[in-house]
């Protein structure tokens, strides 16, 4: 539209007053007048073109942001980055802590389940109890200490059914029953009276009990016999 306006103004330039006063004198005068008009039109066209370029430069310069505006834009950009970093910190860190807490709680529950509801590896389960079936031969006192180190006790008998089950697993093993002498009753390692019958109890040197296939028998406490451990769930 601006170019059209410039061309329009050039085409409608007012005639030169000097040229209006002059009267054409023949062909030579007409040619001179025409040349003057062309020269005048070219000068006006160049001037209009220069004005248009200057206006265009001024228009573009107005669109460019000034130094204070650039500073404000930079500050706003920094503030936005800080806010985004804060949001990420607020969202990510708590979720990470919650996940770690959940994992820790899960591990704790798993450990409790293994301790309370399941037997350790290489142990067998029977009637809510865990049993360690040993292969080493030790004295009664050494067997007692070995089971204590495993957070359990030397094998104990609660009923006849359990006795039959254990006698099938092992032909002979120490149990947690003893007496101070042949004149004292048989007691468990917890100090409770033992109710089941033990054979050969008249021998004064046999003050520790052994589980065998055919029942319970007394034996010398210093003998080397296989031991088993028991841990109740």
Curated annotation (Swiss-Prot):
<dbReference type="InterPro" id="IPR050919">
    <property type="entry name" value="NKG2/CD94_NK_receptors"/>
</dbReference>
<keyword id="KW-0391">Immunity</keyword>
<dbReference type="InterPro" id="IPR001304">
    <property type="entry name" value="C-type_lectin-like"/>
</dbReference>
<dbReference type="GO" id="GO:0062082">
    <property type="term" value="F:HLA-E specific inhibitory MHC class Ib receptor activity"/>
</dbReference>
<keyword id="KW-0325">Glycoprotein</keyword>
<comment type="function">
    <text>Immune inhibitory receptor involved in self-nonself discrimination. In complex with KLRD1 on cytotoxic and regulatory lymphocyte subsets, recognizes non-classical major histocompatibility (MHC) class Ib molecule MHC-E loaded with self-peptides derived from the signal sequence of classical MHC class Ia molecules. Enables cytotoxic cells to monitor the expression of MHC class I molecules in healthy cells and to tolerate self.</text>
</comment>
<dbReference type="GO" id="GO:0004888">
    <property type="term" value="F:transmembrane signaling receptor activity"/>
</dbReference>
<dbReference type="GO" id="GO:0030246">
    <property type="term" value="F:carbohydrate binding"/>
</dbReference>
<dbReference type="GO" id="GO:0045087">
    <property type="term" value="P:innate immune response"/>
</dbReference>
<feature type="short sequence motif" description="Immunoreceptor tyrosine-based inhibition motif (ITIM)">
    <location>
        <begin position="6"/>
        <end position="11"/>
    </location>
</feature>
<feature type="topological domain" description="Cytoplasmic">
    <location>
        <begin position="1"/>
        <end position="70"/>
    </location>
</feature>
<keyword id="KW-0399">Innate immunity</keyword>
<dbReference type="Pfam" id="PF00059">
    <property type="entry name" value="Lectin_C"/>
</dbReference>
<keyword id="KW-0735">Signal-anchor</keyword>
<dbReference type="GO" id="GO:0043235">
    <property type="term" value="C:receptor complex"/>
</dbReference>
<feature type="topological domain" description="Extracellular">
    <location>
        <begin position="94"/>
        <end position="233"/>
    </location>
</feature>
<dbReference type="InterPro" id="IPR016187">
    <property type="entry name" value="CTDL_fold"/>
</dbReference>
<feature type="short sequence motif" description="Immunoreceptor tyrosine-based inhibition motif (ITIM)">
    <location>
        <begin position="38"/>
        <end position="43"/>
    </location>
</feature>
<keyword id="KW-0472">Membrane</keyword>
<keyword id="KW-0812">Transmembrane</keyword>
<keyword id="KW-1133">Transmembrane helix</keyword>
<feature type="glycosylation site" description="N-linked (GlcNAc...) asparagine">
    <location>
        <position position="103"/>
    </location>
</feature>
<dbReference type="GO" id="GO:0002769">
    <property type="term" value="P:natural killer cell inhibitory signaling pathway"/>
</dbReference>
<dbReference type="GO" id="GO:0002250">
    <property type="term" value="P:adaptive immune response"/>
</dbReference>
<feature type="modified residue" description="Phosphotyrosine">
    <location>
        <position position="8"/>
    </location>
</feature>
<feature type="disulfide bond">
    <location>
        <begin position="147"/>
        <end position="229"/>
    </location>
</feature>
<dbReference type="GO" id="GO:0023024">
    <property type="term" value="F:MHC class I protein complex binding"/>
</dbReference>
<dbReference type="GO" id="GO:0045953">
    <property type="term" value="P:negative regulation of natural killer cell mediated cytotoxicity"/>
</dbReference>
<keyword id="KW-1003">Cell membrane</keyword>
<keyword id="KW-0675">Receptor</keyword>
<feature type="domain" description="C-type lectin">
    <location>
        <begin position="118"/>
        <end position="231"/>
    </location>
</feature>
<dbReference type="InterPro" id="IPR033992">
    <property type="entry name" value="NKR-like_CTLD"/>
</dbReference>
<protein>
    <recommendedName>
        <fullName>NKG2-A/NKG2-B type II integral membrane protein</fullName>
    </recommendedName>
</protein>
<keyword id="KW-1015">Disulfide bond</keyword>
<comment type="subunit">
    <text>Heterodimer with KLRD1; disulfide-linked. KLRD1-KLRC1 heterodimer interacts with peptide-bound MHC-E-B2M heterotrimeric complex. Competes with KLRC2 for its interaction with MHC-E. Interacts (via ITIM) with INPP5D/SHIP-1 and INPPL1/SHIP-2 (via SH2 domain).</text>
</comment>
<feature type="region of interest" description="Disordered">
    <location>
        <begin position="1"/>
        <end position="30"/>
    </location>
</feature>
<dbReference type="GO" id="GO:0005886">
    <property type="term" value="C:plasma membrane"/>
</dbReference>
<dbReference type="InterPro" id="IPR016186">
    <property type="entry name" value="C-type_lectin-like/link_sf"/>
</dbReference>
<feature type="glycosylation site" description="N-linked (GlcNAc...) asparagine">
    <location>
        <position position="180"/>
    </location>
</feature>
<dbReference type="GO" id="GO:0001915">
    <property type="term" value="P:negative regulation of T cell mediated cytotoxicity"/>
</dbReference>
<dbReference type="GO" id="GO:0045954">
    <property type="term" value="P:positive regulation of natural killer cell mediated cytotoxicity"/>
</dbReference>
<feature type="transmembrane region" description="Helical; Signal-anchor for type II membrane protein">
    <location>
        <begin position="71"/>
        <end position="93"/>
    </location>
</feature>
């Amino acid at each position: 539209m601006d170019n059209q306006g410039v061309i329009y103004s050039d085409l409608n330039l007012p005639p030169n007053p000097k040229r209006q006063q002059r009267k054409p004198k023949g062909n030579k005068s007409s040619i001179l007048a025409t040349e003057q008009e062309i020269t005048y039109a070219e000068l006006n066209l160049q001037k209009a073109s220069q004005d248009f370029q200057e206006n265009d430069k001024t228009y573009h310069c107005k669109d460019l942001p000034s130094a204070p505006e650039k500073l404000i834009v930079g500050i706003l950009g920094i503030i936005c980055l800080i806010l985004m970093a804060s949001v990420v910190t607020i969202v990510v860190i708590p979720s990470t802590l919650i996940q770690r807490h959940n994992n820790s709680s899960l591990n704790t529950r798993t450990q409790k389940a293994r301790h309370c509801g399941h037997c350790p590896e290489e142990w067998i389960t029977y009637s809510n109890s865990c049993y360690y079936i040993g292969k080493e031969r030790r004295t009664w006192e050494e067997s007692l200490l070995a089971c204590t180190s495993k957070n359990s006790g030397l094998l104990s008998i609660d009923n006849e059914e359990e006795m039959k089950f254990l006698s099938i697993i092992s032909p002979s093993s120490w149990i947690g029953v003893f007496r101070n002498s042949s004149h004292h009753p048989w007691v468990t390692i917890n100090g409770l009276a033992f109710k089941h019958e033990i054979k050969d109890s008249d021998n004064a040197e046999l003050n520790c009990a052994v589980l065998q296939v055919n029942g319970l028998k007394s034996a010398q406490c210093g003998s080397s016999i296989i031991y088993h451990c028991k841990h109740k769930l």
